[in-house]
A protein has these predicted regions:
Chain B
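Extracytoplasmic entry segments of secretory-pathway proteins
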Residues: 1-125, 206-207
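Membrane-embedded segments
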Residues: 93, 99-107, 114-191
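Signature tryptophan residues that serve as conserved aromatic anchors
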Residues: 102-104, 195-198, 269
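Electrostatic cytochrome c docking/interface patches
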Residues: 111-115, 193-222
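Extracytoplasmic/periplasmic beta-strand context in beta-sandwich domains
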Residues: 138, 183-186, 218, 241-243, ...
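The canonical Cys-X-X-Cys-His
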Residues: 172, 217, 223-233, 266, ...
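Extracytoplasmic electron-transfer domains, predominantly the class I c-type cytochrome c fold
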Residues: 200-212, 236-303
Length: 183, 303, 551
């Protein structure tokens, strides 16, 4: 029998992809019809976002590495990989929070203009997915201390697929929100 | 006068083509469903029919026929569409119609006349109308003149309007809230002379009246804050909360054309607006009978 | 043999609702058959509610300038009628049939994820209840089932109705996505060895393809709903044109979900018809490959036709032309199916049971709906008739004459399997003819009302020529439908009180669900035949005239 969990996760993220496509379309659409956005995009901290992007991409790599370690039954490597993933993703979330705080200090809020609405909704929903991912990875990580035997490959590979998806969504967000206005 | 390009005629023609083809197809489906259902009904001791799994050639033939029919209709569609919606690149509208919850504002651009609900157009002449909305989405539809056009806030839509002499009715066709059904459209297509007369009468100030009731009404119109929603100057675009009432008495109907413009109706309306038109934005002002009388008198002088 | 999924429940017969002790077990059940039945009951419950709302609408419109209900209440009622019928009747009804039948038809003993299955059901159920709770929380939504912004925004709809609408739809949407995920994985992983994807019964195939449509379409609605909710609750500006938002974007989101949704509600219905007509004609489906392939074509095209709902918003002719072309194209695979169903009847041996008659009535009525649908691809006709009663007639011919008739056909066909009892054929005939006559009385003339110029969603109209008589006939038809449904409910009740007498295979069917007892035991099958063709039971019953072996 094929891996049902992984299959389910594939279709689920396929479905989620449509959700994010809709949010990205909204963001791009509003950026193009209003002129105010370009002045506002100047307020985004692109270099920091680039560093955060690297963090998220690396965390995908470390998760892959720890899954490989799990398959080879290398407990320590697995734990190490998982903790690196957790640290990197927490750094990413921290960076996002700092970004939000800075924007709020500049009076750029959800209800100020259409840029605020679409920016916070898009990145907010992405962050929500990151948080869900951190929780899922956290659960797997804590399982590795309490009952390592109960950890199953299916759960890890499903979370891995999900985490890669979150990563890829961020790359698109990063491109459309941070890079595109600079081009 | 070029009837070939009139909206409703193009639509009617296309609809007749469609109806003929659709009737034939529907007739065939009904015929075969009933005929087969009857002819091949199960008889006692019937043998199992031959297990026929289908024929590729027949299917492809059918798809071919369907494709041909739809292609023909696609060409007709594109043709009709281009004839009806051929708006120049930088359109300069003759009339700008703005939808409000729940009434229609019309601005005659060249004469900067602002009026509401009763909209006059010259007959047998193509008039370019610009549509937009002040609040939610409304839709302009006069069934006899063909094609509807949505009034979308934030967008300018354009449409050619052409009509024979006469009066035309319609209703807002995009659901726009509580009074959607009562947002009626009334178009009067005047002959060239009548249109000129109408226009010049709109541009003239209303005849002066020397009557104490008139003076009271005029004063009350200011004091009771009518003026903050309704203008009585034909050129005023602001305020836009209520219809411009300049030359109100010249209109045949009021309240988005749901009530005849009579003294009694007007009285009942001003006395208690929500009772006449629920959810209306016009407030109940608790006016005395005398005050209402004076206001009605004043408004009725705005010819 | 790993034919069976391991499920925790012991191997006992299905708990009965008559058995006091087991009544609670329905609440905690993860059995696909019980969940399927609960879906159908949910659908029936909301069908009655939505039907009563429809009666209020028809009563209000029976005569011109009626004041039976206020404009505001009328708007709540028609909004709830549309939302209920689409999200809480047809969607759960078709999903329920799928949940019950798909494991049986592919020889599995459970859905792939039984708990997800239960979760999907309960989320849908609570979504529906939340939507209806709005009546007690300051009024139901009043912006129509497509809730066009900016009318659905806070300044124009200040009551909480729209918020309940958004939350209710998000929940039912999540439920539908959950069910779709389950369908896809079930069909991909739990098929009896030997059943290839090309050998699936058409109902399974169409629900399978349909699941992909759900997975693609519902997230788009959810995204739009979330934005609307953020607008309303957190003062964002997505759909408020006065502050830089766009009134049109909502329509794009809604219809890029909404049009696939139309097919989501009709594809499984096509599947039911493709099961019922062959069995009662004693012939295999005519052109299986074309019926199956046209489903895929419809699914793909359905994502490219949405803007034909928006021809009147003032798009350019190029855009209009593109969507007109795709809308014409999607008519072709639909037509192919109708031709194949008629082809199946050709030289058959047709038994006019209630199920089969519903299928035949479906053929005719759905064709009317399909053809009037094509007239909207002709852009100038759309410009004239969109948002008029012509559209109301069209959608009812598709949803009621199409989806609902086929659900009825499916219920009469599979009822022995579900409950071990046959619904009374005599009462069934009464139900059918009352309902079909009433349906055509109500909606056929509405085409004409639309052409005469009656806009939709109006709570009152002027006494224009023909308006009163046409609307009166329409209302009279609604009462006939009402009577038909009453007969149906009576039929359900007396049938459930009778003794279970149904044999495992009362219709001499060909698909695997007829290879087990009626109703099936908890683990569905004791033994399963080997499957080598699309009609395993046909091969079993006719060893000397087997279908072509496909594996």
């Amino acid at each position: 029998m094929r891996d049902k969990g992984k299959l389910l996760m594939f279709f689920l993220i396929g479905s989620e992809a449509f959700f994010f496509i809709a949010l990205i379309i909204a963001y791009v659409y509003y950026r193009n019809i209003t002129h105010a956005t370009d002045t506002v995009t100047a307020n985004l901290n692109v270099p920091r976002a680039a560093v955060l992007t690297c963090c998220l991409v690396l965390s995908s790599g470390s998760l892959m590495w720890s899954k490989k370690a799990f398959l080879k039954n290398k407990t320590t490597h697995f734990k190490l990989g998982m903790s690196i993933t957790l640290i990197l993703s927490t750094v990413f979330m921290g960076g996002q929070i700092i970004e939000y705080i800075e924007l709020y200090k500049k009076q750029i809020t959800l209800d100020k203009d259409i840029f605020g609405s679409s920016f916070f909704t898009l990145t907010g929903f992405h962050s929500l997915h990151v948080i869900i991912g951190i929780i899922a990875i956290g659960i797997l990580f804590s399982f590795s201390f309490i009952k390592f035997k109960n950890l199953i490959k299916n759960a890890i590979s499903a979370v891995e697929v999900y985490w890669h998806f979150v990563d890829v969504v961020w790359l698109f967000v990063f491109f459309f929100v941070y890079i595109k206005p600079l081009l | 006068m070029n009837w070939e390009t009139n909206n409703i005629h193009i639509i009617r023609e296309l609809f007749v083509y469609f109806l003929v083809v659709a009737t034939i197809i529907l007739g065939l489906v009904i015929f075969f469903t009933i005929f087969y259902g009857w002819k091949y009904r199960r008889r006692p001791n019937a043998e199992t029919p031959t297990q026929d799994h289908g024929s590729k050639r027949f299917e492809i033939l059918m798809i071919g026929i369907a494709f041909t029919i739809t292609s023909v209709f696609f060409v007709l569609t594109v043709n009709g569409m281009n004839q009806i919606q051929n708006i120049p690149d930088n359109p300069i509208p003759d009339i700008i119609i703005t939808g409000h919850m729940w009434w229609w504002e019309a601005e005659y651009r060249t004469d900067s006349i602002i009026t509401a609900n009763e909209i006059h157009i010259p007959a047998n002449k193509k008039v370019l109308v610009q549509f937009n909305s002040d609040d939610v989405i409304h839709s302009w539809w006069i069934p006899k003149l063909g094609r509807k056009m949505d009034l979308v806030p934030g967008y300018d839509n354009y449409m050619w309007l052409q009509a024979d002499e006469g009066e035309y009715w319609g209703t807002c066709s995009e659901f726009c809230g509580a009074q959607h059904a009562l947002m009626r459209i009334h178009i009067i297509a005047d002959s060239e002379d009548d249109f000129k007369i109408w226009k010049s009468s709109q541009l003239k100030p209303p005849p002066a009246t020397q009557n104490p009731l008139f003076e009271t009404g005029k004063r009350l119109f200011q004091e009771k804050t009518c003026i903050s929603c309704h203008s009585v100057n034909i050129h005023d675009k602001e305020p836009v909360i209520g219809p411009n009432l300049a030359h109100f008495a010249s209109r045949k109907y009021f309240l988005s054309n749901i009530e005849l413009n009579t003294t009694e109706n007007l009285y009942a309306w001003i006395k208690n607006p929500p009772a006449v038109k629920p959810n209306t934005q016009m407030p109940f002002l608790a006016l005395t009978d005398k005050e209402v009388n004076a206001l009605v008198y004043y408004i009725k002088t705005l010819r | 043999m790993s034919l069976f999924v391991n499920i925790a429940e012991p191997d006992k017969t299905l708990p009965s609702i008559k058995n006091d002790k087991d009544r609670l077990s329905w609440l905690s059940s993860v059995d696909h058959k019980q969940i399927g039945i609960m879906y159908l009951l949910l659908s029936l419950f909301f069908f009655i509610l939505g039907g009563l709302e429809a009666m209020i609408i028809r009563w209000q419109l029976a005569v011109p300038e009626n004041d039976f209900v206020s404009a505001d209440f009328y708007n709540q009622i028609f909004t709830m009628h549309g939302t209920t019928m689409i999200f809480l009747v047809l969607t759960p009804g078709l999903i329920g049939l799928g949940v019950y039948l798909i494991p049986l038809m592919i020889g599995a003993n459970e859905m792939a994820f039984p708990r997800l299955n239960a979760f999907s059901f309960w989320v849908t159920c609570f979504g529906g209840l939340l939507l209806y709770f709005s009546f007690f929380a300051g009024g139901a939504p009043t912006a129509g089932w497509f809730s066009y912004a900016p009318l659905s925004e806070k300044p124009y709809s200040p009551t909480t109705g729209i918020d309940y609408y958004i939350l209710g739809l998000l929940l039912t949407g999540i439920g539908s996505i959950g069910a779709a995920l389950n369908f896809v994985v079930t069909v991909l992983t739990l098929r009896l060895p030997g059943i290839k994807l090309t050998m699936l019964p058409l109902f399974v195939w169409m629900t399978f393809i349909n699941a992909f449509l759900i997975l693609g379409a519902f997230p788009l609605l959810n995204a739009g709903l979330v934005m609307l909710l953020i607008d309303r609750q957190l003062d964002a500006l997505f759909f408020l044109p006065s502050s830089g938002g766009s009134a049109i974007l909502w329509q794009h989101f809604f219809w890029s979900f909404g049009h696939p949704e139309v097919y989501i509600l009709i594809l499984p219905a096509f599947g039911i018809i493709s099961e019922v007509i062959p069995v009662f004609s004693r012939k295999p489906i005519y052109g299986y490959v074309f019926v199956a392939a046209s489903t895929v074509a419809i699914a793909l095209l359905s994502f490219g036709v949405w803007a034909h709902h928006m021809f009147a918003v003032g798009m350019t002719n190029t855009v209009n032309g593109f969507f007109a072309a795709s809308s014409f194209l999607i008519g072709i695979p639909t037509g192919v199916k109708v031709i194949n169903w008629i082809g199946t009847m050709y030289k058959g041996s047709i038994q006019l049971t209630v199920a089969m008659t519903f299928a035949l009535v479906f053929l005719i009525n759905f064709t009317i709906g399909g053809l009037s649908g094509v007239s909207f691809a002709i852009v100038p006709i759309d410009w004239q008739l969109t948002d008029s009663y012509y559209v109301v007639a069209h959608i009812h011919y598709v949803f009621l004459g199409g989806s609902a008739f086929s659900i009825f056909a499916g219920i009469y066909y599979w009822f022995p399997k579900f409950c071990g009892r046959h619904l009374s054929e005599k009462l069934g005939q009464w139900h059918l003819w009352l309902f079909v006559t009433g349906f055509n009385m109500t909606f056929l003339l509405q085409h004409i009302l639309g052409i005469l110029g009656m806009p939709r969603r109006i709570n009152t109209y002027l006494d224009l020529p023909y308006f009163e008589s046409l609307n009166m006939i329409s209302t009279a038809g609604a009462f006939l439908m009402f009577a038909g449904v009453a007969v149906f409910l009576y039929n359900l009740i007396i049938t459930m009180r009778s003794k279970p007498t149904a044999t495992p295979d009362p219709w001499d069917g060909w698909t695997l669900e007829w290879a087990t007892a009626s109703p099936p035991p908890l683990k569905n099958f004791d033994t399963l035949p080997e499957v080598h063709s699309r009609r395993p039971l046909w091969d079993l019953k006719n060893p000397d005239n087997k279908d072509k072996r496909l594996n």
